[in-house]
């Protein structure tokens, strides 16, 4: 931190470890934001992909362990925790999903736990994971963004997956004709065929915007909240490095207070992402507009 400007420190912590096609024709890691930008579309954020997969595996292993040790007798702490979590998600699905599908509850559970784990990485001190990446790589300037949900590519990827399910179930339940009719015959209608035909472009524009807004808002809400939270942690670290917080006790209070508040944020954002997914899929299962 001492060798970096505040701006450089912030940019370094908010830059992804990007692997792609370098300008010289080789494949490798970008060391600057400019190099990452020049890689174009076929660039991979290795840190985001790595943490997402690793946390997904942790989720699977924990629940597999709980399932293998499940007993009808005196349950252990892990089984109690998993049962409470499953009942909470199951109750949320029953309250908000009005169709019939064996997929929705497991999907909601996966989304809630996975997003929560990805958000929770934000509670790790901002320099720990990047420093570990530097030690492993031997490169003091390697960028590394530890929190997957601060990468819009991750949140948009999850949102587009939900969007694909919305389209799939809309067509499955309503049929192609019903899906097209939902986009073109509502919200405005008329018994006059000529007037109805004139209203089709207006209806399509309104319904299409509403449909596309679902994944975009889903992705940007999660990304915006987590990015802002990570930025606050980084700014507190910058203040330490700048000597502005010469009272270490005040610094500890700031870090602790924001971390405690952030626990609420990471949980709430995981819950909101899950609930909106349930609601959107419930709307897709409704046969009537």
Curated annotation (Swiss-Prot):
Give the keywords, sorted: ATP synthesis, Cell inner membrane, Cell membrane, CF(0), Hydrogen ion transport, Ion transport, Membrane, Transmembrane, Transmembrane helix, Transport
Topology in membrane:
Multi-pass membrane protein
* PROSITE patterns with a match to the protein in the record: ATPASE_A
Give one GO term, molecular function aspect. Answer: proton-transporting ATP synthase activity, rotational mechanism
Superkingdom of this protein's organism? Bacteria
* Biological process according to GO: proton motive force-driven plasma membrane ATP synthesis
Q: Name one Pfam family in it.
A: ATP-synt_A
Q: Which GO terms describe its cellular component?
A: plasma membrane; proton-transporting ATP synthase complex
Q: Record's InterPro entries?
A: ATP_syn_F0_a_bact/chloroplast, ATP_synth_F0_asu, ATP_synth_F0_asu_AS, F0_ATP_A_sf
Any idea where this protein resides?
Cell inner membrane
Query: What are the transmembrane regions?
Result: 43-63, 101-121, 160-180, 193-213, 232-252, 259-279
Q: Does the keyword Transport apply?
A: yes
UniProt subunit comment: F-type ATPases have 2 components, CF(1) - the catalytic core - and CF(0) - the membrane proton channel. CF(1) has five subunits: alpha(3), beta(3), gamma(1), delta(1), epsilon(1). CF(0) has three main subunits: a(1), b(2) and c(9-12). The alpha and beta chains form an alternating ring which encloses part of the gamma chain. CF(1) is attached to CF(0) by a central stalk formed by the gamma and epsilon chains, while a peripheral stalk is formed by the delta and b chains.
This molecule's function is given as: Key component of the proton channel; it plays a direct role in the translocation of protons across the membrane.
Q: Which family does it belong to?
A: Belongs to the ATPase A chain family.
Family matches, as PANTHER family: ATP SYNTHASE SUBUNIT A, CHLOROPLASTIC (PTHR42823:SF3)
Please state what the protein is called.
ATP synthase subunit a
User: What's the source species for this entry?
Assistant: Pseudomonas syringae pv. tomato (strain ATCC BAA-871 / DC3000)
Q: What is the lineage of its organism?
A: Bacteria, Pseudomonadati, Pseudomonadota, Gammaproteobacteria, Pseudomonadales
